[in-house]
C-alpha cells in the first residue's frame, strides 16, 4: 500500500499540502488516522481495560456510552435518507436492525442495557439519559448533525472507525472479564456480537469511499470525516476522565454510590 506523509495532520484535518492521488493512498491515510487517533489510545480506556477503575467509574462509562449507542440508529436512519440508491439503503438498513433489533430479536441497545443492569444501574434512569455528561450529549448530537449536514460521502466515511473496533472490543472483553468481578459473559454480550458485525460494516464503508472518492478533494474530505469521528469518540472519554477520574462531576450528572 502506498506510503503517505501525514506529518502536517492537524486536530481537524489531514492538513494542507497533503494530496491523496488514488484509492490506495486514501486507504493508507485512513488506516494511519485509526492507528494514531482511535480512542483505544485514550488514558480512560487504558484504565478501564486494565482493571484500574472502580465500579462507580465503570457505571459512569456505561451510562454515558448508552447515549451514544442508542443514538446510532437515529444517525444511521439519517444517513439512509441521503441516498436515492436502493442498494445502498438496503446495505445500510441492517445497521439499524443491528442496534434496534427486530420483533422478537435482540439488538445492540438491549445488549447494552444488559451491561448497565449488570452494573446495578436502574434501566429507567439509563434510558432517560438525564445523568449523562453535557459533553457526551454535545458530542453525540454533533455526530448526528454531521451526518445530516455534510455530504453523503462524508457521512459514510465518518463510520470508518468500525475498521478499528474489533481490536478494542477484544481488548475490552478480555480485560474486563479478567479484572472486574461485577461483569460476566452475559453482560459483555454487546462487544462479542460486534466482533462479527463491525467488520461487515467497515468493509462496506471502506469499499464505498474507495470507489466514490475520485478526486484529491473528496479523498481529503473522507479523511477529515474520519478525524471528526475520532474526535467525537475521544472527547467523550476526556469528559469521563475529567469527571470521574479527576473528580470534577458537573451539576446534575450521575454521582456513583460505589467507589
Curated annotation (Swiss-Prot):
Molecular function, one GO term: pyrroloquinoline-quinone synthase activity
Protein name: Pyrroloquinoline-quinone synthase
Family to which this protein belongs: Belongs to the PqqC family.
Broad EC category: oxidoreductase
Any one biological process term the GO annotation gives: pyrroloquinoline quinone biosynthetic process
Function: Ring cyclization and eight-electron oxidation of 3a-(2-amino-2-carboxyethyl)-4,5-dioxo-4,5,6,7,8,9-hexahydroquinoline-7,9-dicarboxylic-acid to PQQ.
The enzyme's E.C. designation: 1.3.3.11
Superkingdom, natural source: Bacteria
Family annotation (SUPFAM superfamilies): Heme oxygenase-like
Gene3D superfamilies associated with the record: Heme oxygenase-like (1.20.910.10)
Pfam families reported for this sequence: TENA_THI-4 (PF03070)
Listed pathway(s): Cofactor biosynthesis; pyrroloquinoline quinone biosynthesis
Ranges in coiled-coil conformation: none
Lineage of source species: Bacteria, Pseudomonadati, Pseudomonadota, Alphaproteobacteria, Hyphomicrobiales
Reactions that this protein is recorded to catalyse: 6-(2-amino-2-carboxyethyl)-7,8-dioxo-1,2,3,4,7,8-hexahydroquinoline-2,4-dicarboxylate + 3 O2 = pyrroloquinoline quinone + 2 H2O2 + 2 H2O + H(+)
Keywords from the named record: Oxidoreductase, PQQ biosynthesis
